Each structure stands twice: as C-alpha cells, then as structure tokens.
C-alpha cells in the first residue's frame, strides 16, 4: 500500500502540559509490570486502571500499585474486549499496551479514537498496513502513538549519540546500525 503523502500538517502534535498524567495499562504479563513499576516512581503520574484477561496478572498489577503507596487502580479484563470499557471511562490521558502482538494495532487505534495517547510495546504493528493505520489514526485524532522501543535509549546508544554530537567521529556522512535477534518463533504464534 502506498501512503497518501502530502504537505506536512500546519498544526503540530503539541499537547498542553499536564500536572498529572492519568495512566492505564493493558497487559500485565511479560512487559506490562516493568512499565507499571517505572510509572509508579514518577511524580505526577497516576495509575488509574489496569486491564488483563488473566485475573492473577491484573491483581499483581494492583498489588504493585498499592505496595508503592498509591491508590488501588480500577481493574478490567472480564473478556478480551474489556479494555474498551476501560478506555470509555474517559479518565485516561495515556495507555500502555503490552499485549500479544496481534492486539497492538486494534488497541492502539481504539485508544487514540477515544482521545487517549497510545504507548505500544514492540512491535507496534506486524504489517506495513498496520503501521500506516497507527500513523493515520494518530494524525487524524492528534493523539500521540509511541512504540516503546528501549534499545535506542540504552547507556551505550546514548553515549554514541553524544559522541556524534561532540564531533568525536568527525563529519558523519553515513551511519548504519542493526539490532537483530531471532523472533521467528513469536511470528509463528500469531499465524
């Protein structure tokens, strides 16, 4: 599919600063708890709700929240689409999506359609069309959509970036890098 390219929008995606950022979490399996743990340490971030179809996982998220001295979040997850009820409550600024890959695009789109910024675990999409659906929804709704890629924010990566900015390598004419690990087994799970 060829994207419909045109002039850049005249308006930007700037969002007014929020005194408190109301956060929701979909998925408390492998990656969700690490995002929750990080948010619980940030002043001005409030954990409002957690959704997971696996009851022990959502209860674990609630326990993490109260153990950090924060109010217990509202829990969702009675069925695979209960996340929509959470989004429909209208009390979230941002939602972290840490679910199986095939849910990333529909959940991200549903969040942005409801005025909620979507922070999506990697990969944000598993098809090019899925990528474009996220981009187009973000542009249309003026809600941010961020893929939660962490590799480019590691100590080594930021050190190299700083060295480039300081001119340690001279004038850079071309750069190339890769981060590769075998994920074919995960792709088979969603086929």
Stretches found by the model and what they are:
Residues 27, 144-146, 151-191:
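Predominantly a Rossmann-like dinucleotide-binding segment in NAD(P)-dependent oxidoreductases
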Residues 54, 76-80, 100-103, 124-126, ...:
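Short, solvent-exposed turn/loop segments enriched in Gly/Ser/Thr/Pro and often Arg
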């Amino acid at each position: 599919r060829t994207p419909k390219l045109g002039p850049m929008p005249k308006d930007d995606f700037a969002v007014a600063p929020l005194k408190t950022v109301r956060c929701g979490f979909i998925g408390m399996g492998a990656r969700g708890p690490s995002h929750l743990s990080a948010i619980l340490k940030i002043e001005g971030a409030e954990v409002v709700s957690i959704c997971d179809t696996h009851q022990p996982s959502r209860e674990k998220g609630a326990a993490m929240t109260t153990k950090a001295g924060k109010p217990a979040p509202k829990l969702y997850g009675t069925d695979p689409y209960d996340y929509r009820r959470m989004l429909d409550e209208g009390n979230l600024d941002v939602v972290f999506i840490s679910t199986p890959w095939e849910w990333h695009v529909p959940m991200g789109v549903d969040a942005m359609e409801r005025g909620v910024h979507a922070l999506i675990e990697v990969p944000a999409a598993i098809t090019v069309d899925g990528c474009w659906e996220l981009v187009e929804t973000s542009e249309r709704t003026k809600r941010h959509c961020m893929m939660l890629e962490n590799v480019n924010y590691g100590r080594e990566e930021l050190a190299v970036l700083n060295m480039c900015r300081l001119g340690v390598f001279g004038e850079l004419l071309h750069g190339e890098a890769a981060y590769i690990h075998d994920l074919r087994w995960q792709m088979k799970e969603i086929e």
